[in-house]
Design a protein with these regions (language model features):
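Sec-dependent N-terminal signal peptides
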Residues: 3-13
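Structural motif marking the loop-to-transmembrane transition
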Residues: 1-2, 52
Length: 207
């Protein structure tokens, strides 16, 4: 009985009650912003026990419903990417901010699988774009969550995209020709490193 109680106590310490931090709420400038944050928190509570695939589908669809704002990813003079808090408070963002917010949402839902911010090139337009790549396991190709698509598909089924490089845990990789494994590459992106610094200083949830 003591072991059961101890396990329950320890698990409750690390449980996420999905309650927005007061500091996060205080940075809202209007009621719409507060409503977005609270609705997101309730959504996270609702889906926390869904399956791996279902979580990916639901998070992708939910965040894709927020308005895109094409304001900075293609502008080389802007070196700021928004955190999940900033993205939600603003009620939308650019492609990289959808990918960042999906990554953080899945992590908070207990999806600890390997995931990276994947920079791709669109074959048709030749423009660069960012999506979230998530590996169900390291022997399978990643699944792609894209703000331009409500479907979660394996990378090989995204015929319209060419993977360029992958940002994960402060490091840089490229996806090998097998479409599954990663290889370190020697590049640096100041925008990504600035994002990491901001995220370390930010407290999204109350607990």
């Amino acid at each position: 009985m003591r072991k059961i109680l101890l396990l329950f106590f320890v698990s409750s310490l690390f449980a996420n009650n999905f309650e927005i931090s007061p500091k996060n709420i205080s940075q809202c400038k209007n009621q719409i912003c507060k409503n977005i944050l609270n609705h997101y928190a309730n959504f996270m509570k609702k889906i926390e026990h869904e399956s791996f695939i279902r979580k990916l589908e639901l998070i992708n669809s939910y965040l894709n419903s927020l308005m895109p704002r094409y304001d900075d990813f293609y502008n080389t003079n802007v070196d700021v990417w928004s955190t999940r808090s900033e993205f939600l408070r603003r009620g939308g963002g650019d492609c990289e901010e959808y990918a960042i917010s999906k990554r953080d949402s899945l992590k908070d839902l207990g999806v600890d699988n390997q995931k990276c911010l994947l920079v791709v090139q669109e074959k048709k337009t030749k423009k660069y774009h960012m999506v979230l790549a998530v590996w169900e396991n390291l022997h399978k190709e990643p699944l792609i969550l894209d703000n331009l698509s409500f479907r979660v598909l394996p990378l090989s089924k995204r015929y319209d995209l060419v993977p360029e490089y992958c940002l994960m845990d402060g490091k840089y990789f490229k996806i090998k020709k097998d479409g599954i494994s990663l290889e370190p590459i020697n590049i640096r992106m100041q925008t990504y490193e600035n994002l990491i610094k901001k995220e370390k200083e930010e407290k999204f949830w109350k607990n």
